[in-house]
């Protein structure tokens, strides 16, 4: 079944114009770009994710290779489209899907529901530390019922638990979007069953090798808490399994350092809201492109005439 949010391009004109201002892109180019997104050959999938692709392309901006949602710039229509996509996924019958298609489905649902949850409860927060919480003590963002699947109300915690228990793949953790900058990044394209495992492998390598995620100091492997949150579910609670996983995904320099690792330590997680500030980016770009002020020409001071009859004794 093919579906289209036919008004998506028109109702997100404000976001498109912001993108054009910051990237010096004309509206015509944006329309052409949107048509290109729609014309991409759809990978075979029992669920049509083309609207998901278009939506995520329109509401996210790639910042340093990491897609971030422009929460502050989304209008009510954009929020509605996010909700419509959540409703569409919630209405799907997934009982006959194979394992990879089910995995892709739950990852896509988790990602878009997280975006919706942040829009509802967290977009005005600089930090999601309290709202997100931890694996042991999840906050409201994770525990509040967000979507109904098959007549059952589900929270992000419920969706996460399903992903971790139903699919025997440690790379699943790299598809669980946390809404924070210290977690795995949001995808600008939907997961598809035929490519989901390869995509998660790419996510794993990107995350493990990201700055500050995994470091080795004095034979201690310092990790972001995300790995320790999921150690039991993804790595059997075994430090050796986790270390082997990190080595498999590390680049040569990090991999060499990991061989010196003898123990693990948890670092702090960057709970900053994972969003792109369109206005700030525009201001920074404008400042960078502003021509330097010309120095004022130096003038030689002219001698002032002495007043007649002047002097201290007059």
Place the predicted regions along the sequence by residue:
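Feature targets compositionally biased, intrinsically disordered low-complexity regions
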Residues: 6, 132, 260, 308-312
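Bacterial N-terminal signal peptides that target proteins for export
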Residues: 1-9
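Interaction/scaffold regions that mediate signaling and macromolecular assembly across diverse proteins
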Residues: 25-296
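Boundary at the C-terminal end of the N-terminal hydrophobic targeting segment
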Residues: 19-23
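Long, low-complexity, intrinsically disordered segments
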Residues: 295-314
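Intrinsically disordered, low-complexity, compositionally biased regions/tails
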Residues: 11, 265, 313-314
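Intrinsic structural disorder/low-complexity segments
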Residues: 7, 286, 305-307
């Amino acid at each position: 079944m093919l579906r289209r949010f036919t008004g998506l391009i028109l109702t997100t004109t404000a976001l498109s114009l912001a993108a054009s201002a910051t990237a010096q892109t004309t509206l015509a180019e944006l329309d052409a770009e949107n048509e290109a997104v729609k014309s991409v050959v759809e990978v075979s999938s029992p669920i049509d994710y083309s609207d998901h692709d278009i939506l995520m392309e329109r509401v996210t901006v790639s910042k340093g290779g990491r897609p971030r949602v422009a929460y502050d710039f989304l209008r009510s229509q954009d929020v509605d489209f996010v909700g419509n996509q959540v409703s569409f996924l919630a209405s799907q019958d997934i009982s006959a899907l194979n394992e990879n298609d089910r995995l892709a489905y739950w990852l896509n649902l988790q990602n878009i529901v997280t975006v919706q949850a942040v829009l509802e409860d967290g977009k005005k927060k600089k930090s999601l530390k309290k709202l997100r919480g931890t694996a042991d003590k999840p906050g409201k963002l994770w525990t509040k019922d967000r979507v109904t699947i098959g007549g059952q109300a589900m929270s992000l915690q419920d969706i996460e638990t399903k992903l971790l228990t139903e699919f025997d793949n440690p790379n699943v953790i790299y598809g669980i979007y946390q809404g924070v900058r210290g977690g795995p990044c949001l995808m600008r394209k939907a997961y598809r069953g035929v490519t989901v495992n390869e995509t998660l492998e790419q996510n794993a390598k990107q995350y493990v090798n990201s700055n500050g995620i995994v470091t080795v100091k004095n034979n201690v492997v310092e990790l972001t808490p995300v790995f320790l949150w999921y150690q039991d579910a993804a790595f059997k609670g075994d430090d050796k399994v986790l270390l082997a996983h990190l080595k498999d995904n590390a680049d040569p320099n990090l991999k060499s350092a990991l061989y010196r690792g003898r123990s693990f330590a948890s670092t702090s997680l960057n709970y900053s809201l994972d969003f792109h500030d369109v206005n700030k980016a525009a201001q920074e770009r404008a400042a960078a492109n502003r021509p330097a002020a010309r120095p004022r020409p130096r003038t030689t001071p002219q001698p002032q005439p002495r007043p007649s009859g002047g002097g201290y004794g007059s």
